[in-house]
Regions:
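Glycine- and small hydrophobic-enriched segments that form the cores of compact globular domains
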Residues: 162-174, 178, 185
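Glycine-centered loop/turn motifs
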Residues: 58-64, 71, 264-268, 282, ...
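Assembly/oligomerization interface modules of large self-assembling protein complexes
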Residues: 31-99, 152
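Long, contiguous amphipathic alpha-helices that act as assembly "spine/axial" helices in icosahedral shell
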Residues: 80-158, 178-209, 379-387
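Autoprocessing Asn-cyclization modules and mimics
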Residues: 255-324
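A generic N-terminal leader/anchor concept
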Residues: 1-58, 281-288, 304-305
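Hydrophobic, glycine-enriched assembly/anchoring segments
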Residues: 2-13, 331, 349-410
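Extended oligomerization regions of viral-like shell subunits
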Residues: 194-258, 330-354
Protein backbone atom coordinates (compact mmCIF):
# COMPACT_ATOMS: atom_id res chain seq x y z
CA UNK A 1 0.00 0.00 0.00
CA UNK A 2 1.17 3.50 -0.80
CA UNK A 3 1.09 6.67 1.20
CA UNK A 4 -1.53 6.82 3.93
CA UNK A 5 -3.65 3.97 2.55
CA UNK A 6 -4.54 1.39 5.15
CA UNK A 7 -3.52 3.55 8.12
CA UNK A 8 -6.58 3.97 10.39
CA UNK A 9 -5.13 6.99 12.22
CA UNK A 10 -4.94 8.93 8.94
CA UNK A 11 -8.51 8.27 7.85
CA UNK A 12 -10.30 11.61 7.66
CA UNK A 13 -13.06 10.66 10.08
CA UNK A 14 -10.55 9.48 12.67
CA UNK A 15 -8.26 12.45 12.07
CA UNK A 16 -11.00 15.04 12.52
CA UNK A 17 -12.29 13.28 15.64
CA UNK A 18 -8.78 13.51 17.08
CA UNK A 19 -8.37 17.18 16.27
CA UNK A 20 -11.87 18.10 17.49
CA UNK A 21 -10.87 16.85 20.96
CA UNK A 22 -8.25 19.56 21.35
CA UNK A 23 -9.74 22.18 23.65
CA UNK A 24 -9.47 25.87 22.74
CA UNK A 25 -6.91 27.20 25.25
CA UNK A 26 -8.09 29.66 27.94
CA UNK A 27 -5.58 32.18 26.57
CA UNK A 28 -7.86 32.62 23.52
CA UNK A 29 -9.99 34.99 25.55
CA UNK A 30 -12.31 36.34 22.85
CA UNK A 31 -12.82 32.99 21.12
CA UNK A 32 -14.08 31.57 24.41
CA UNK A 33 -16.16 34.65 25.25
CA UNK A 34 -18.19 34.95 22.05
CA UNK A 35 -20.18 32.18 20.29
CA UNK A 36 -19.76 30.74 16.78
CA UNK A 37 -22.61 30.22 14.32
CA UNK A 38 -22.87 28.57 10.90
CA UNK A 39 -23.87 31.02 8.16
CA UNK A 40 -25.60 30.00 4.93
CA UNK A 41 -23.03 31.47 2.49
CA UNK A 42 -19.56 32.98 2.34
CA UNK A 43 -21.03 36.47 2.04
CA UNK A 44 -21.68 37.35 5.66
CA UNK A 45 -24.40 39.88 6.41
CA UNK A 46 -25.32 41.26 9.82
CA UNK A 47 -27.39 43.99 11.45
CA UNK A 48 -25.90 46.71 13.66
CA UNK A 49 -27.70 48.44 16.49
CA UNK A 50 -26.75 51.59 18.36
CA UNK A 51 -28.38 51.87 21.78
CA UNK A 52 -30.32 48.84 22.95
CA UNK A 53 -32.10 49.64 26.19
CA UNK A 54 -35.68 49.80 24.94
CA UNK A 55 -38.68 48.14 26.56
CA UNK A 56 -42.22 47.17 25.62
CA UNK A 57 -44.65 50.13 25.78
CA UNK A 58 -47.91 50.32 27.72
CA UNK A 59 -51.09 50.16 25.63
CA UNK A 60 -54.77 50.38 26.39
CA UNK A 61 -56.66 47.08 26.61
CA UNK A 62 -58.23 46.15 23.28
CA UNK A 63 -55.85 48.32 21.25
CA UNK A 64 -53.46 47.23 18.51
CA UNK A 65 -49.98 46.21 19.64
CA UNK A 66 -47.20 48.50 18.37
CA UNK A 67 -44.84 46.83 15.93
CA UNK A 68 -41.13 46.45 16.46
CA UNK A 69 -38.61 45.10 13.96
CA UNK A 70 -35.86 42.61 14.64
CA UNK A 71 -33.42 44.55 12.48
CA UNK A 72 -30.98 47.15 13.68
CA UNK A 73 -30.44 50.61 12.26
CA UNK A 74 -27.39 49.66 10.21
CA UNK A 75 -26.07 46.68 8.34
CA UNK A 76 -22.78 45.15 7.31
CA UNK A 77 -21.78 42.74 4.58
CA UNK A 78 -18.43 41.17 3.69
CA UNK A 79 -16.91 38.08 2.16
CA UNK A 80 -15.66 35.56 4.70
CA UNK A 81 -11.93 35.19 5.27
CA UNK A 82 -10.27 31.86 4.49
CA UNK A 83 -7.12 30.48 6.08
CA UNK A 84 -5.24 27.20 5.89
CA UNK A 85 -1.82 25.58 6.21
CA UNK A 86 -0.26 22.13 6.05
CA UNK A 87 2.42 19.94 7.64
CA UNK A 88 4.47 17.17 6.03
CA UNK A 89 5.01 13.68 7.50
CA UNK A 90 7.70 11.55 5.83
CA UNK A 91 8.01 7.91 4.77
CA UNK A 92 9.57 6.79 8.05
CA UNK A 93 6.59 8.19 9.92
CA UNK A 94 4.17 6.32 7.63
CA UNK A 95 6.02 3.04 8.10
CA UNK A 96 6.06 3.43 11.87
CA UNK A 97 2.36 4.24 11.92
CA UNK A 98 1.63 1.01 10.04
CA UNK A 99 3.17 -0.81 13.01
CA UNK A 100 5.66 -3.05 11.20
CA UNK A 101 7.97 -3.06 14.22
CA UNK A 102 7.48 -2.68 17.94
CA UNK A 103 4.40 -1.25 19.60
CA UNK A 104 6.59 1.48 21.11
CA UNK A 105 7.60 2.58 17.61
CA UNK A 106 3.93 2.82 16.67
CA UNK A 107 3.15 4.88 19.77
CA UNK A 108 5.99 7.26 18.95
CA UNK A 109 4.51 7.84 15.49
CA UNK A 110 1.06 8.35 17.02
CA UNK A 111 2.44 10.96 19.40
CA UNK A 112 4.14 12.68 16.47
CA UNK A 113 0.83 12.82 14.62
CA UNK A 114 -1.04 14.08 17.68
CA UNK A 115 1.57 16.76 18.36
CA UNK A 116 1.56 17.95 14.76
CA UNK A 117 -2.23 17.97 14.58
CA UNK A 118 -2.48 19.87 17.85
CA UNK A 119 -0.03 22.51 16.64
CA UNK A 120 -2.00 23.00 13.42
CA UNK A 121 -5.26 23.26 15.36
CA UNK A 122 -3.75 25.72 17.85
CA UNK A 123 -2.47 27.97 15.06
CA UNK A 124 -5.82 27.84 13.28
CA UNK A 125 -7.69 28.81 16.45
CA UNK A 126 -5.12 31.55 17.02
CA UNK A 127 -6.11 33.11 13.72
CA UNK A 128 -9.74 33.30 14.89
CA UNK A 129 -8.64 34.96 18.10
CA UNK A 130 -6.59 37.49 16.12
CA UNK A 131 -9.56 38.32 13.89
CA UNK A 132 -11.90 39.00 16.81
CA UNK A 133 -9.23 41.04 18.60
CA UNK A 134 -8.61 43.19 15.50
CA UNK A 135 -12.34 43.79 15.13
CA UNK A 136 -12.72 44.93 18.74
CA UNK A 137 -9.47 46.82 19.34
CA UNK A 138 -9.28 48.59 15.96
CA UNK A 139 -12.85 48.49 14.65
CA UNK A 140 -11.49 47.07 11.38
CA UNK A 141 -10.21 43.81 9.93
CA UNK A 142 -8.06 43.21 6.84
CA UNK A 143 -7.44 39.93 5.01
CA UNK A 144 -6.78 38.44 1.58
CA UNK A 145 -9.43 37.49 -0.96
CA UNK A 146 -9.37 35.79 -4.37
CA UNK A 147 -6.68 37.06 -6.71
CA UNK A 148 -4.52 38.29 -3.85
CA UNK A 149 -6.73 41.32 -3.26
CA UNK A 150 -6.70 42.78 0.22
CA UNK A 151 -10.15 43.22 1.76
CA UNK A 152 -10.88 45.51 4.72
CA UNK A 153 -14.02 45.55 6.87
CA UNK A 154 -15.07 48.53 8.99
CA UNK A 155 -17.39 47.62 11.85
CA UNK A 156 -18.98 51.03 12.38
CA UNK A 157 -17.51 51.84 15.79
CA UNK A 158 -18.14 55.56 16.48
CA UNK A 159 -14.99 57.68 16.26
CA UNK A 160 -15.80 59.10 19.71
CA UNK A 161 -15.11 55.61 21.10
CA UNK A 162 -11.46 55.79 19.98
CA UNK A 163 -9.63 58.31 22.16
CA UNK A 164 -5.95 59.22 21.95
CA UNK A 165 -4.81 61.30 24.92
CA UNK A 166 -2.70 64.36 24.23
CA UNK A 167 0.73 64.86 25.80
CA UNK A 168 -0.54 66.71 28.85
CA UNK A 169 -3.04 63.92 29.66
CA UNK A 170 -0.90 60.89 28.81
CA UNK A 171 -0.92 58.37 31.64
CA UNK A 172 2.83 57.93 31.83
CA UNK A 173 4.10 61.42 32.62
CA UNK A 174 1.50 63.95 31.43
CA UNK A 175 1.33 67.06 33.60
CA UNK A 176 -2.48 66.83 33.79
CA UNK A 177 -2.77 63.04 33.69
CA UNK A 178 -5.81 61.57 35.39
CA UNK A 179 -6.45 57.90 34.50
CA UNK A 180 -9.31 57.65 36.98
CA UNK A 181 -11.23 60.46 35.29
CA UNK A 182 -10.50 59.12 31.79
CA UNK A 183 -11.72 55.63 32.71
CA UNK A 184 -14.92 56.93 34.29
CA UNK A 185 -15.55 59.14 31.24
CA UNK A 186 -15.14 56.08 29.00
CA UNK A 187 -17.52 54.06 31.13
CA UNK A 188 -20.10 56.84 31.07
CA UNK A 189 -19.92 57.24 27.29
CA UNK A 190 -20.66 53.54 26.77
CA UNK A 191 -23.60 53.81 29.18
CA UNK A 192 -24.94 56.92 27.41
CA UNK A 193 -24.50 55.59 23.86
CA UNK A 194 -25.17 51.87 24.15
CA UNK A 195 -27.39 51.96 27.24
CA UNK A 196 -25.39 49.14 28.82
CA UNK A 197 -22.75 49.09 31.54
CA UNK A 198 -19.33 47.83 30.40
CA UNK A 199 -18.38 44.67 32.27
CA UNK A 200 -14.91 43.96 30.83
CA UNK A 201 -11.70 45.96 30.80
CA UNK A 202 -8.57 44.70 29.06
CA UNK A 203 -4.94 45.74 29.12
CA UNK A 204 -1.54 44.08 29.14
CA UNK A 205 0.95 43.98 32.01
CA UNK A 206 2.81 47.08 30.85
CA UNK A 207 -0.34 49.18 31.02
CA UNK A 208 -1.24 47.63 34.38
CA UNK A 209 2.17 48.70 35.68
CA UNK A 210 1.52 52.28 34.56
CA UNK A 211 -1.77 52.30 36.49
CA UNK A 212 -0.26 50.63 39.57
CA UNK A 213 2.29 53.41 39.99
CA UNK A 214 -0.04 56.29 39.14
CA UNK A 215 -0.05 58.74 42.05
CA UNK A 216 -3.80 59.39 41.95
CA UNK A 217 -4.63 55.68 42.01
CA UNK A 218 -2.19 55.09 44.87
CA UNK A 219 -3.70 58.03 46.75
CA UNK A 220 -7.19 56.60 46.26
CA UNK A 221 -5.92 53.19 47.32
CA UNK A 222 -4.48 54.57 50.54
CA UNK A 223 -7.95 55.80 51.50
CA UNK A 224 -9.65 52.52 50.65
CA UNK A 225 -9.89 49.12 52.27
CA UNK A 226 -7.22 47.81 49.90
CA UNK A 227 -4.30 49.57 51.56
CA UNK A 228 -2.88 46.33 52.91
CA UNK A 229 -0.54 45.18 50.17
CA UNK A 230 -3.21 43.60 47.99
CA UNK A 231 -2.36 46.00 45.18
CA UNK A 232 0.76 44.01 44.36
CA UNK A 233 -0.43 40.52 45.31
CA UNK A 234 -3.53 40.69 43.11
CA UNK A 235 -3.27 43.97 41.17
CA UNK A 236 -5.90 43.34 38.48
CA UNK A 237 -8.67 42.54 40.97
CA UNK A 238 -7.81 45.51 43.19
CA UNK A 239 -7.68 48.01 40.32
CA UNK A 240 -10.96 46.65 38.90
CA UNK A 241 -12.74 46.91 42.25
CA UNK A 242 -11.25 50.30 43.03
CA UNK A 243 -12.36 51.85 39.74
CA UNK A 244 -15.58 49.89 39.28
CA UNK A 245 -14.61 48.61 35.83
CA UNK A 246 -15.94 45.07 35.96
CA UNK A 247 -13.76 42.13 35.01
CA UNK A 248 -10.24 43.40 34.43
CA UNK A 249 -8.35 40.97 32.20
CA UNK A 250 -4.59 41.18 31.83
CA UNK A 251 -4.13 40.05 28.24
CA UNK A 252 -0.45 39.45 27.49
CA UNK A 253 -0.87 37.19 24.47
CA UNK A 254 1.33 37.71 21.39
CA UNK A 255 1.00 36.57 17.82
CA UNK A 256 3.64 35.79 15.23
CA UNK A 257 3.66 36.49 11.50
CA UNK A 258 6.17 34.90 9.13
CA UNK A 259 7.15 35.54 5.52
CA UNK A 260 9.93 34.43 3.20
CA UNK A 261 12.29 36.94 1.63
CA UNK A 262 11.83 37.10 -2.14
CA UNK A 263 14.99 39.13 -2.78
CA UNK A 264 18.35 39.28 -1.02
CA UNK A 265 18.77 42.19 1.38
CA UNK A 266 21.01 45.09 0.37
CA UNK A 267 21.75 48.55 1.75
CA UNK A 268 18.12 49.46 1.01
CA UNK A 269 15.62 49.64 3.87
CA UNK A 270 12.87 48.24 1.61
CA UNK A 271 12.45 44.51 2.17
CA UNK A 272 10.57 42.28 -0.29
CA UNK A 273 8.58 39.33 1.09
CA UNK A 274 6.16 36.77 -0.32
CA UNK A 275 3.24 37.92 1.87
CA UNK A 276 3.13 41.21 3.79
CA UNK A 277 -0.57 41.01 4.66
CA UNK A 278 -0.30 40.74 8.45
CA UNK A 279 2.77 42.89 9.02
CA UNK A 280 2.15 46.21 10.78
CA UNK A 281 4.09 49.43 11.19
CA UNK A 282 5.43 49.92 14.69
CA UNK A 283 6.27 46.28 15.24
CA UNK A 284 9.70 44.69 15.08
CA UNK A 285 10.73 42.35 12.30
CA UNK A 286 13.34 39.67 12.94
CA UNK A 287 15.53 38.48 10.04
CA UNK A 288 16.50 34.80 10.34
CA UNK A 289 19.46 33.17 8.59
CA UNK A 290 18.05 29.68 7.94
CA UNK A 291 21.50 28.15 7.39
CA UNK A 292 22.60 28.92 10.97
CA UNK A 293 21.18 28.09 14.36
CA UNK A 294 19.35 30.93 16.09
CA UNK A 295 21.04 33.65 14.05
CA UNK A 296 18.95 36.78 13.54
CA UNK A 297 18.75 40.58 13.45
CA UNK A 298 15.92 42.83 14.63
CA UNK A 299 14.72 46.01 12.91
CA UNK A 300 11.74 48.32 13.48
CA UNK A 301 8.97 48.31 10.85
CA UNK A 302 8.37 51.86 9.59
CA UNK A 303 5.70 51.10 6.96
CA UNK A 304 4.12 48.23 5.03
CA UNK A 305 2.91 48.10 1.42
CA UNK A 306 0.77 44.98 1.29
CA UNK A 307 -0.03 45.31 -2.40
CA UNK A 308 3.66 45.52 -3.36
CA UNK A 309 4.73 42.94 -0.78
CA UNK A 310 7.27 45.25 0.84
CA UNK A 311 8.27 46.16 4.38
CA UNK A 312 10.24 49.35 5.05
CA UNK A 313 12.49 49.08 8.11
CA UNK A 314 14.26 51.78 10.10
CA UNK A 315 17.72 50.51 9.12
CA UNK A 316 18.88 47.81 6.76
CA UNK A 317 20.23 44.61 8.38
CA UNK A 318 24.00 44.52 8.72
CA UNK A 319 24.21 40.90 7.58
CA UNK A 320 23.06 39.64 4.20
CA UNK A 321 19.85 37.61 4.20
CA UNK A 322 19.11 35.64 1.05
CA UNK A 323 15.85 35.68 -0.87
CA UNK A 324 14.15 32.29 -1.15
CA UNK A 325 16.22 30.92 1.75
CA UNK A 326 15.79 33.20 4.74
CA UNK A 327 12.65 34.46 6.44
CA UNK A 328 11.37 37.37 8.50
CA UNK A 329 9.17 37.15 11.58
CA UNK A 330 7.10 39.81 13.32
CA UNK A 331 5.98 39.24 16.88
CA UNK A 332 3.40 41.61 18.27
CA UNK A 333 1.07 41.83 21.25
CA UNK A 334 -2.64 41.46 20.63
CA UNK A 335 -3.20 44.61 22.69
CA UNK A 336 -0.41 47.24 22.64
CA UNK A 337 1.36 48.46 25.77
CA UNK A 338 -0.34 51.85 25.55
CA UNK A 339 -3.98 50.74 25.16
CA UNK A 340 -6.75 50.48 27.75
CA UNK A 341 -9.86 48.80 26.33
CA UNK A 342 -13.33 48.59 27.84
CA UNK A 343 -16.45 46.87 26.52
CA UNK A 344 -19.75 45.20 27.31
CA UNK A 345 -20.03 41.62 26.11
CA UNK A 346 -23.84 41.71 25.89
CA UNK A 347 -26.58 44.20 24.99
CA UNK A 348 -30.32 43.71 24.75
CA UNK A 349 -29.95 40.23 26.20
CA UNK A 350 -27.61 38.99 23.44
CA UNK A 351 -23.87 38.85 22.89
CA UNK A 352 -22.53 41.93 21.08
CA UNK A 353 -20.28 39.86 18.81
CA UNK A 354 -20.26 36.49 17.11
CA UNK A 355 -18.04 34.47 14.81
CA UNK A 356 -19.84 33.47 11.61
CA UNK A 357 -18.52 30.23 10.12
CA UNK A 358 -18.86 30.15 6.32
CA UNK A 359 -19.30 27.03 4.15
CA UNK A 360 -16.39 25.95 1.94
CA UNK A 361 -15.12 22.97 -0.05
CA UNK A 362 -16.96 20.49 -2.28
CA UNK A 363 -18.73 18.96 0.70
CA UNK A 364 -19.90 22.40 1.96
CA UNK A 365 -18.40 22.07 5.42
CA UNK A 366 -18.27 24.66 8.19
CA UNK A 367 -15.53 25.54 10.64
CA UNK A 368 -12.27 23.77 11.26
CA UNK A 369 -11.51 20.77 9.04
CA UNK A 370 -8.47 18.56 8.44
CA UNK A 371 -7.62 16.44 5.39
CA UNK A 372 -4.60 14.67 3.88
CA UNK A 373 -2.83 14.28 0.54
CA UNK A 374 -0.27 11.62 -0.34
CA UNK A 375 3.10 12.32 -1.96
CA UNK A 376 4.43 9.66 -4.33
CA UNK A 377 8.21 10.18 -4.42
CA UNK A 378 9.48 10.28 -1.80
CA UNK A 379 6.48 8.78 -0.07
CA UNK A 380 4.88 10.94 2.57
CA UNK A 381 1.64 12.63 3.47
CA UNK A 382 0.54 16.23 3.92
CA UNK A 383 -1.84 17.05 6.78
CA UNK A 384 -3.81 20.20 5.97
CA UNK A 385 -6.13 22.27 8.15
CA UNK A 386 -8.64 24.87 6.94
CA UNK A 387 -11.22 27.28 8.30
CA UNK A 388 -13.41 30.03 6.92
CA UNK A 389 -15.49 32.72 8.52
CA UNK A 390 -15.74 36.27 9.80
CA UNK A 391 -16.35 37.91 13.18
CA UNK A 392 -19.28 40.33 13.31
CA UNK A 393 -20.07 43.13 15.75
CA UNK A 394 -23.77 43.76 16.37
CA UNK A 395 -23.42 46.65 18.83
CA UNK A 396 -20.48 48.84 17.77
CA UNK A 397 -21.05 51.41 20.52
CA UNK A 398 -20.36 48.93 23.34
CA UNK A 399 -16.56 49.26 23.01
CA UNK A 400 -14.14 52.03 24.00
CA UNK A 401 -10.40 52.29 23.37
CA UNK A 402 -8.01 54.68 25.12
CA UNK A 403 -4.54 55.13 23.62
CA UNK A 404 -2.94 56.43 26.79
CA UNK A 405 0.52 57.49 25.62
CA UNK A 406 2.92 57.36 22.70
CA UNK A 407 4.70 54.02 22.60
CA UNK A 408 7.95 55.81 21.77
CA UNK A 409 7.79 57.36 25.22
CA UNK A 410 7.64 54.04 27.02
Amino acid sequence: MKGSQGIPALQLVTLNKLISKFVIPPSNFFTNLFPSTQYDSDTIEWEMEYGSGGMTPFVAPGSVAPAIGIDGIGSGSAKAAYWKEKMYFDEEFLNNLREPGTYATYLTAERQLAKGAQKLRWRCDRRREWMVAQMLFNGTLSYLQAGGLKFSVSYGVPTSHFVTLDDSRNWKDGASRNPIEDIFDAKQLIIDDAMVTPNYSIMNSQMLKVLLFDSKIQELLAKSAFGNGDLFSRPAQVIASLLGIGNLTVYDELYEVQAWLTTTTTSSTTIYVDDATDFEAGGKVRFYDMTKYNTFEDEVIMSVDRAAGTIVVGAHPTSTFVGGRDKVVMRKKFIPDNVFFMFADAAGGSKVAEFMEAPYGNSRRWGFYADTKDEWDPEGVWLRVQDKGLPVLYNPDTTYKITAFDLDEY
